[in-house]
Amino acid sequence: MTTTPLSPSTPSNVQVPDIQGRFGRFGGKYVPETLMPALAELETAYQQYRNDPGFQAELQQLLRDYVGRATPLYFAERLTAHYARPDGTGAQIYLKREDLNHTGAHKINNALGQVLLAKRMGKQRIIAETGAGQHGVATATVCARFGLECVIYMGVHDMERQALNVFRMRLMGAEVRPVAAGTGTLKDATSEAIRDWVTNVETTHYILGSVAGPHPYPMMVRDFHAVIGQETRAQALEKWGGLPDILLACVGGGSNAMGLFYEFVNESSIKLIGVEAAGEGVNTEKHAATLTKGRVGVLHGAMSYLLQDEDGQVIEAHSISAGLDYPGVGPEHSYLKDVGRAEYYSVTDEEALAAFQRLSRLEGIIPALETAHAIAYLETLCPQLDGSPRIVINCSGRGDKDVQTVAKFLIPQ
């Protein structure tokens, strides 16, 4: 199977940002004046190249030969049997295997697209933020491929729990800058990356790693990841002659979920479910369930749901998963929540750890802790379902990076 063009095949009534970059009341450009010309330049370049035949040809060739797309749509036979009813019926569970991409996660789809764009804009220096390290690794990878200077900002707490990915980034020539401010996690790394961009905007392109931030990033990152849903549509039609009934993905900033969802937003019969990190519980102060418990505010250049205190100050998020440990969410997810097109739930650290072990033992697939949150929601979802609906879960990344973290909590029996 070949990869499909960047432009989605979804009908034209899909909500896309307006010229101000808004999804309903969400999104926008809440940035210093210094960055407005850079965002305008980026949007102009993206609109110029997104459907340019030469750009598309290079992107598709690299996605195929360098990244390894298309990724399989895998029937999880033993996981399906685990949730089957006594009569053998029940949900049919499929995994969209983004973990099989080069670098081990979905993140390279976006990093590759943005680097090709940056090259055409004449930028020679690339910066990025990272939490779990997968976006940092993907960015370092494509910078090595094209010989570009690469600086990655990463919170000191995340560097400790993702030491393997830190080494991988440095191995490929990236400079990894520790961020000790705040909680030393993804929010703080993002803030530092934006400060760098403000200072070096003439020579530097900022590869934001999620569907967050100021316009055009939420739209652009979504579009570069839309290949996930496009392939899923084609593969589902090939495998069973229809479409999935339910799409399930973890949500931190929300890029892997939007990559899967976007192709199907106008297929009203398909349920879209995002799963956030409940941490130690949504009724504690240690969680990252932004769409479950957040209120509308502005963070990192966009209006969206945020975790805030009574004074409107952004509060610390918590998750065992570094990639979900973020107090905001992409504005398109906030829009999909408000209009009722997608549903968002949360699972705890403990539930995610159990799912991490369950998928490993039942399928021989070690998922990222982020992905494990989506897998964990099957415990709640499957008993509620009638018949044998087909569920596609975005297996957004592999869990090699998380083994040391998990080993502190799980002792294999």
Swiss-Prot record:
<keyword id="KW-0057">Aromatic amino acid biosynthesis</keyword>
<comment type="function">
    <text>The beta subunit is responsible for the synthesis of L-tryptophan from indole and L-serine.</text>
</comment>
<comment type="pathway">
    <text>Amino-acid biosynthesis; L-tryptophan biosynthesis; L-tryptophan from chorismate: step 5/5.</text>
</comment>
<dbReference type="InterPro" id="IPR036052">
    <property type="entry name" value="TrpB-like_PALP_sf"/>
</dbReference>
<keyword id="KW-0822">Tryptophan biosynthesis</keyword>
<dbReference type="InterPro" id="IPR006653">
    <property type="entry name" value="Trp_synth_b_CS"/>
</dbReference>
<comment type="similarity">
    <text>Belongs to the TrpB family.</text>
</comment>
<keyword id="KW-0456">Lyase</keyword>
<dbReference type="InterPro" id="IPR023026">
    <property type="entry name" value="Trp_synth_beta/beta-like"/>
</dbReference>
<dbReference type="InterPro" id="IPR006654">
    <property type="entry name" value="Trp_synth_beta"/>
</dbReference>
<keyword id="KW-0028">Amino-acid biosynthesis</keyword>
<dbReference type="GO" id="GO:0004834">
    <property type="term" value="F:tryptophan synthase activity"/>
</dbReference>
<feature type="modified residue" description="N6-(pyridoxal phosphate)lysine">
    <location>
        <position position="107"/>
    </location>
</feature>
<protein>
    <recommendedName>
        <fullName>Tryptophan synthase beta chain 2</fullName>
        <ecNumber>4.2.1.20</ecNumber>
    </recommendedName>
</protein>
<dbReference type="InterPro" id="IPR001926">
    <property type="entry name" value="TrpB-like_PALP"/>
</dbReference>
<comment type="subunit">
    <text>Tetramer of two alpha and two beta chains.</text>
</comment>
<dbReference type="GO" id="GO:0005737">
    <property type="term" value="C:cytoplasm"/>
</dbReference>
<keyword id="KW-0663">Pyridoxal phosphate</keyword>
<dbReference type="Pfam" id="PF00291">
    <property type="entry name" value="PALP"/>
</dbReference>
